[in-house]
């Protein structure tokens, strides 16, 4: 009986550790960045770049290959202006989302292969509207009444 119990605890510990690691979201913002600064890093790209190199800048913060990411080819101030459109419901049910008035140039990067740091992406260029979640700015954010903090979806 005793040997079975000895084998149980390390397995339970391993299971609990696995559950704890699974709770760390890939999109968790890096320490020292506001949510809006992290949004800017992940989603604002006025001049289009190839997905492999653009995603390298994001993945270095998380030490993982992010599965999917959308880059908006607009300056941050233009994306922040979207926060002034009427509130709509986000995918998660929150009511702090806003949709762009018109379609914008954007690039969607989808992970095709690789393990960090050798992540490989397929890119898809589109001209579509988008939805972002907005919140009041934090210290260090640009001066806007609301700033984008989460990319919700392409519409």
Swiss-Prot record:
Disulfide partners: 65-119, 83-134, 90-97
Pfam families documented for this protein: RnaseA
GO cellular component, one term: extracellular space
InterPro entries: RNaseA, RNaseA-like_dom_sf, RNaseA_AS, RNaseA_domain
Annotated binding of substrate, by residue: 66-70, 91
Keyword Disulfide bond set for record: yes
Subcellular location, record wording: Secreted
Enzyme active site: 43, 150
EC numbers, comma separated: 3.1.27.-
One example of a Gene Ontology biological process annotation: innate immune response
Domain of life of the native organism: Eukaryota
Enzyme class label: hydrolase
GO molecular function, one term: nucleic acid binding
Annotated keywords: Disulfide bond, Endonuclease, Hydrolase, Nuclease, Secreted, Signal
Cross-referenced CDD domains: RNase_A_canonical (cd06265)
Keyword RNA-binding tagged: no
Signal peptide: 1-28
Function, in words: Has a low ribonuclease activity.
Protein family (similarity comment): Belongs to the pancreatic ribonuclease family.
Name of the protein: Ribonuclease 8
Taxonomic classification: Eukaryota, Metazoa, Chordata, Craniata, Vertebrata
Gene coding for it: RNASE8
